[in-house]
Design a protein with these regions (language model features):
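Conserved alpha/beta-hydrolase "nucleophile elbow" surrounding the catalytic nucleophile
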Residues: 48-50, 122-123
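Short glycine/proline-centered loop/turn elements that form peptide/ligand docking sites
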Residues: 59, 63, 150
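Core alpha-helical elements of the protein kinase catalytic domain
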Residues: 55, 62, 106-110
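Flexible "cap/lid" subdomain of the alpha/beta-hydrolase fold that forms the substrate-access gate
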Residues: 2-18, 29, 43, 79-121, ...
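Conserved alpha/beta-hydrolase
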Residues: 63-86
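A short loop-to-beta-strand scaffold at the N-terminal edge of the catalytic core in hydrolase folds
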Residues: 24-34
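Serine-hydrolase catalytic-loop signature spanning alpha/beta hydrolases and amidase-signature enzymes
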Residues: 51-59, 71
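Short beta-strand element of the alpha/beta-hydrolase
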Residues: 40-48
Length: 276
């Protein structure tokens, strides 16, 4: 795994620094920091989502630092400049369990010399990690803010089953089979991202990685005029297929092909309100 240097100052706002913290649950953890000049400040930990980085928080960090906090945003396990995880498709995925992400956060907090965190805030996938941090160690993570992804709570244990026969479980691939059998065959984007070709599809996309990601984020943002959220009635293939193709893709298209028809023009980008 290639070890990259810290981010250069010219790509960061003044007052935000990039560095590495070593030996964090087996990781060489890349972090961004603000408000580090003054010792003893309460700690705020910011956890990014997918597909994002610590860099996503750069414009949030300075206002929090100005409010008197030390603000730290790591590249989570599997992302960015952080190394020490198994990046092979056929590698061991055990280290990516959510409770191990909590250990990563705890290790970082301890390495920075803190015994508690004033606030852990998470966006998207980071919201799940933040929620579990607060659930598992409320003595450390004193408050929590969740953005974009709601937390349903810990798994519910089977109840009153000693004298009652267990109910058969639905097959895990049921929804995927439903989507694939629609008149317009579809697939869930998370299933696609778990397949072997997905990484190469995006790295080698015809648009180029930068343009593809710019189009992908535009497609998912409020700047894309087709985004008109509405509640789904139930968890069925037909109902899920009402969602945009960045969520429920056409079965035989990869994500680069999915984004290609909605790539933003220069005028679209110039008029963006949600993405700078």
């Amino acid at each position: 795994m290639t070890e990259l240097p810290p981010l250069q100052d010219d790509v960061l706002p003044s007052g935000v620094r990039s560095r590495f913290v070593h030996d964090i649950n087996g990781l060489r953890l890349h972090v961004l920091e603000a408000g580090f000049e003054t010792c003893g400040r309460p700690l705020v930990l910011l956890l990014h989502g997918f597909p994002e980085l610590a860099y996503s928080w750069r414009k949030v960090m300075l206002p929090l630092a100005a409010a008197g906090f030390r603000v730290v945003a790591p590249d989570q396990r599997g992302y960015g400049r952080t190394t020490g995880w198994d990046g092979e498709y056929d590698g061991d995925l055990g280290s990516f369990r959510i409770l191990n992400a909590v250990r990563d956060a705890l290790g970082l907090v301890s390495a920075l010399g803190y015994r508690e965190v004033a606030l852990v805030a998470g966006h998207d996938f980071g919201a799940s990690v933040a929620a579990w941090c607060a659930l598992v160690r409320p003595d450390v993570f004193r408050s929590v803010a969740l953005m974009s992804a709601p937390f349903a709570g810990p798994p519910v244990l089977p109840f009153d089953t000693a004298d009652n026969p267990s109910q058969p479980k639905s097959p895990d691939n049921g929804i995927h089979d439903e989507l694939a059998k629609l008149d317009r065959p579809r697939k869930h984007y998370q299933w696609y991202y778990s397949t072997r070709p997905a990484n190469a599809d995006m790295w080698r996309c015809p648009q180029g990685v930068h343009a593809f990601l710019r189009g992908y984020f535009h497609y998912k943002s409020a700047d894309w005029k087709g985004n008109k959220p509405f509640p789904l009635k139930c968890w069925t293939g037909g109902e899920l297929a009402k969602m945009p193709t960045y969520y429920i893709m056409d079965l035989h298209k990869n994500m680069a092909e999915t984004v290609a028809p909605v790539m933003p023009s220069a005028a679209d980008i110039a008029s963006c309100q949600w993405l700078a």
